[in-house]
Amino acid sequence: MFPSRHLFLFLVLVFCFTQVHGVTSYSVDEQENISIYAKSSRAVVNISNIAVNYDFYYRAIPAESGSGTGFLINKSGIIVTNYHVVENASKLVVTLSDNSQWPGKLVGADPNNDLAIVRIRAPAESYGVLKFSHSNDIVVGQKVLALGNPFGLRQTLTTGIISALGRTIAAKNGRKIEGIIQTDAAINPGNSGGPLLDSDGNVIGINTAIIGSAGSVGIGFAVPSNTALRILPDLLKYGYVRRPWLGIEPIPTVYLRRIGIDIQEGLLIARVVNGASADNAGLRGASETVKVGRYKVPWGGDIITHINETPVASMEDLAQQIETRKSGEKVTVRFIRLKKVHSVVVELVLRPRS
């Protein structure tokens, strides 16, 4: 009896051991990745940019000129992506995670921040949505996940960390995008416009660029979510971002110093637009043109050196201090006129659409 009993217990233990080890176990980190992918992937889409070419007989020949990623943010079919993904598109085709395809309509675009909004008319139950988190709360070293369609390989998940904050990169139109998130999560061509997620599965950035044309080398960039949250209302309502301006044509004095002119660092006002903020505040543009060597230089205008105590010496400095504000806000402009330092309070107005 005892041998039989011992044999029975032995077989039970072997069976339990086999069952336990036959079940795949995942680490806490792996479980988190799996959960985020399961919850988020239905909100991520592929966007094909279809251009139209014409043959010898002027017959239209559609051709895919590029593709990228986007993600849905509500059940009205609103998709966030990069501007360069949809730029110059004759037709947009959006592919959902269930492989269904829908025509996309460009709702709004902001080339300065490389962001755009596309809308589809698909059944709400056919896709998921993602929520934004505030990028002001993120820190270097925290875990991030990138979802996208690199090289056309749809629904690809990569992981990494935030490598740095506050980077500056150039948009395709040459304007500087500031406050950029740097990550080592693998980002490749086709990932553009996809979400950069935190460990709760919320969007903290929009993947936009990599270093090197051949693909990821461990350095990718994302536009922070707070930038998107700031401009999305304008894109949805107006189709573009309404930005304030001073209404001046400035010349960075660094260029004048290079040709031998002894001048304070700042922005020389070449011209003031009638009725604009600078004009209303009494700022003055150039009163004459002087010749320096073979160059003709506007001269006699005020030289702006600071805005709200922040030095400004380039077009990017000026844009950062003015265009990130709202119409009606007031700023203090410090400037030099006839070798004397002055200050004036300027109330900002919107830049005309034209």
Identify the function of each model-found stretch.
Residues 1-8:
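Bacterial N-terminal signal peptides that target proteins for export
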